[in-house]
Amino acid sequence: MRFSIISLVSLPLFLGLTYAGGVEKDERNNVCTVKANGKQKDDMPNLFKAFKECGNGGTIIFPEDQSYWIGTRLNPLLNDVTVQWRGKWTFSDNLDYRRNNSFPVAFQNHRVGFIISGHNVTIDGNGNTWYTAEKGVTQSGRPMPFVFWNVSEVNVENFYVKDPPLWSLNIMNGTNMRFNNIYCNATSVDAPYGYNWVQNTDGFGSFSAVNTMDAVNIQLTNFVYQGGDDCITIKPRSYNIDIQNVTCVGGNGIAVGSLGQYLEDSSVENVRVDKVKIIRYNEDMHNSAYIKTWVGALVPQSSYESAGLPCGGGWGNVRNILFSNFEVQGANAGPSVNQDSGNNGSYSGSSLMTVSNIVFANFTGYTSGGTSVTSKVSCSEVHPCYNIEFDDVLLYPGKNASNLGTGSCKYTANGGVHGLEGC
């Protein structure tokens, strides 16, 4: 799937045309302009028509003065298309329909409400309905509002996702993609202070960052996230990921992982994350930058994300990862590695993932974890991690602390960790 994005000034302008909700097609130029129905009437039939008629070598326009109501699911197949997406999309608040009719995703038992690609996008996921209904206990069926699935040569700019029910912006099988000026906000208006009702609302990610998975050659610049889970997650089989200028407000920081949850290669290689601000919000900011892999055996799980099935035992390499220039304001923890996800107490140090050539460089600020230990490295007895570098990681264990924090390490190769006091 190839996309050619051009600026608004070069698009034909349909000034003076009036619509009662529908699709206006310029046959000569293969351009479809979609007008919203209004009054919370489902706009999906018109969207489907536009994607069908102009989704192959054409242009689809969603004017900026339009508000679209997304009542049903959609997965158009597009080719060589330009999407000028200025209007606002709001997903319906029909929770029963969404739980039972979204597209299933095998990874962590999730679902997707809408799969497409576009440019200049504002999506309102109507997530507060979900946050209030579940009150911090995620249930199966919450849909991701937006997924790039099986795409290549994609450029996305000025993209805003408001109140996503689940992961905000995801890549599943994507190659050569560039994202710039992306904003994701998941804020519960009903949650009591100090309570996180917006868990699993990850920002950007490679699911296959923002979630990424099966993603190659991905660039993300100028990204802002406010929410209650991973700001950016880089998941299995993500390669050549470059991320710069990020602000994470609340949640769980920048994650590589989780990896190894399933019996498959879960490698991640060649990642740079640079110039990041980590800001505590609503007493919620768990990590700053971390790598997490599952234990090396199938372990019974009870959470909905595992669909009640045992998980773990995946393999692969996590290597050539650089986290640099982080300003940490009150996260519970500094940079860390944890290879014991999914452990029930009997499988510590059993991960089959090999972690190596990791650099945490130029971290400043303070943590709020209530301990002098600001960084932990817990790897694998099966494949002890090595070449883990802490270079100018200067974090204080509290806003008013006078001494720098220390670290702790286990299941690492002899001399495998450098620059972390206590290891």
UniProtKB/Swiss-Prot annotation:
Provide the disulphide bond pattern: 231-248, 379-385, 409-423
**Mind listing the GO biological process terms from this record?**
cell wall organization; polysaccharide catabolic process
Q: Which UniProt keywords apply?
A: Carbohydrate metabolism, Cell wall biogenesis/degradation, Disulfide bond, Glycoprotein, Glycosidase, Hydrolase, Polysaccharide degradation, Secreted, Signal
Molecular function as annotated in GO: galacturan 1,4-alpha-galacturonidase activity; polygalacturonase activity
The reaction(s) annotated as catalysed by this protein in its Swiss-Prot or TrEMBL entry are: [(1->4)-alpha-D-galacturonosyl](n) + H2O = alpha-D-galacturonate + [(1->4)-alpha-D-galacturonosyl](n-1)
Its primary localisation, in coarse terms, equals secreted
Q: What is its EC number?
A: 3.2.1.67
Q: What Gene3D superfamilies is this protein classified in?
A: Single-stranded right-handed beta-helix, Pectin lyase-like
- Positions annotated as glycosylated: 100, 120, 150, 173, 185, 245, 344, 362, 400
What InterPro entries does this protein map onto?
Answer: Glyco_hydro_28, Pectin_lyas_fold, Pectin_lyase_fold/virulence
**One Pfam family this chain carries?**
Glyco_hydro_28
Taken from the UniProt entry, a GO cellular component term is: extracellular region
| Highest taxon listed in the record's lineage | Eukaryota
Q: Which residues form the signal peptide?
A: 1-20
- Active-site residues, as the UniProt record annotates them: 229 (proton donor), 252
Any idea where this protein resides? Secreted
Which family is annotated? Belongs to the glycosyl hydrolase 28 family.
Q: What does this protein do?
A: Specific in hydrolyzing the terminal glycosidic bond of polygalacturonic acid and oligogalacturonates.
Protein name stated in the entry: Putative galacturan 1,4-alpha-galacturonidase C
Q: Which gene encodes it?
A: rgxC
